[in-house]
């Protein structure tokens, strides 16, 4: 993985020094590859092994631990991931996470993807199941699981498997759980970061954007406020 991170740095240097055309390679492409690598190295090369220390595996362990602990009250959890959404063939993080949760003992029907609810009727049905605790783990992207996703009733934990582009997206994600109508007095938000990758840069970038927005809104220096 370190070798691949170095490869991204080399590519960035070539882009900065104008050694490659923007059509060949550019910072957006490099950043996207960096985000994929931070999520799971198999998104860069499906032949690479599953890293036991990956953040997806850390998330699986934490989700299962909370699922087990809150069995009696049937508390629910949300996993947000904008990259590597479910697909029919080839590797994707959604199916990988679900398969591992099922292997640990969670019934498959209790782990659902928002992407499978492709009509308003199916969506309403799915949201109802999350609210009553029939579905206990819901996975989705910011776009599909943001505004209008009212499933807060039993939500006890929310997991950020990747970092969205905008501060508003983080607020949108967290707002699914931290709102009126949640029966839990205490809730947890987990952010998963892969060391020595684009992850810390991405979260730092979003935090700085938020400070800048706050500065404009309040006309204050973010360092002083």
Residues of each region from the PLM?
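A conserved SF2-helicase RecA2
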Residues: 165-174, 178-225
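SF2 helicase motor core recognition
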Residues: 34, 124, 138-160, 166-186
């Amino acid at each position: 993985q370190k070798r691949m991170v170095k490869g991204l740095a080399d590519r960035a240097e070539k882009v900065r020094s104008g050694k490659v055309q923007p059509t060949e390679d550019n910072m957006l492409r490099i950043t996207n590859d960096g985000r994929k690598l931070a999520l799971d190295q198999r998104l860069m090369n499906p032949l690479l092994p599953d890293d036991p220390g990956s953040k997806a595996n850390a998330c699986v362990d934490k989700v299962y631990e909370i699922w087990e602990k809150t069995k009696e009250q049937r508390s629910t959890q949300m996993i947000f991931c904008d990259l590597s959404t479910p697909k029919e063939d080839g590797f994707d993080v959604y199916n990988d996470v679900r398969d591992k949760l099922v292997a640990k003992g969670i019934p498959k029907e209790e782990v659902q993807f928002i992407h499978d609810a492709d009509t308003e009727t199916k969506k309403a049905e799915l949201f109802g199941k999350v609210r009553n605790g029939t579905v206990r783990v819901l996975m989705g992207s910011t776009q599909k699981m943001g505004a209008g996703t009212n499933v807060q009733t039993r939500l006890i934990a929310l997991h950020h498997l990747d970092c969205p582009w905008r501060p508003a997206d983080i607020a949108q994600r967290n707002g699914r759980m931290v709102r009126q109508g949640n029966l839990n007095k205490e809730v947890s938000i987990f952010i998963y970061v892969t060391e020595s990758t684009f992850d810390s840069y991405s979260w730092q970038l979003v935090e700085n954007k938020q400070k800048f927005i706050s500065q404009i809104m309040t006309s204050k220096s973010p360092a002083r406020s």
